[in-house]
């Protein structure tokens, strides 16, 4: 009897251990796909790849970034929303998730997702070619006023964050400019560096490489303070224009992902956000790390959606 009990106990122990092992390894069993709604080389792509490469060691599997571009981000946003809710496909959601519906570019809103974390925020700049005939924002405004409707400001898609940034600046400065849309910031920055357009209204992170190479100059940033890495760049407010504006970026899941899988993903990406290697990489990219947990991010999305609508109505950009 004693031997039978010992055998039964041993069997139960082994079964229980095996069961526990299986439970702890249910997710992830394979690599994860992270959808980026914007093109390679832009600020969204750069910060997403940085956080994913760090999160891999905490998640215990590979995270492959897949760029699905077009429609002011709506193609990528839809791909995230429509993904199978098994935790193996998620993606980065950005400001345009909240601006697209106001233009009729999407038939869904932030409510179609379960927000995981906020990753970063990024202020817009007004950037021009290095040898442009204006060296200050005031000189650029004077140039625009002397050439109404002829100055081209490049940004991302119509109604995108950088388009709105340019619109806010133009409205505040009282200038008439022509907005030139690109499918992401990278193309716009290349165009201004090559002298094909007069200016761009994109983030500092997105002009950094061209700025460091001496191909462009930043006239002002739409932030509350000067950038630490470039203290000579004035804020828009210092230049006489009360404009603070920029994008936000976070990670979203399709509705229906289980609480258990969400918890695993949340833990991995939260640890990644606090990882010194990620923080250093973000700093080198001139990206502002702005962490919000799922609950705080959800509230932020709601408030930002309503505020974005009000701003777009003010600029006449709503459908």
In which residue ranges do the predicted regions lie?
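Hydrophobic helical h-region of N-terminal Sec-dependent signal peptides
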Residues: 6-14
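N-terminal (or domain-start) structured segment
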Residues: 21-111, 150, 175-198, 289-291, ...
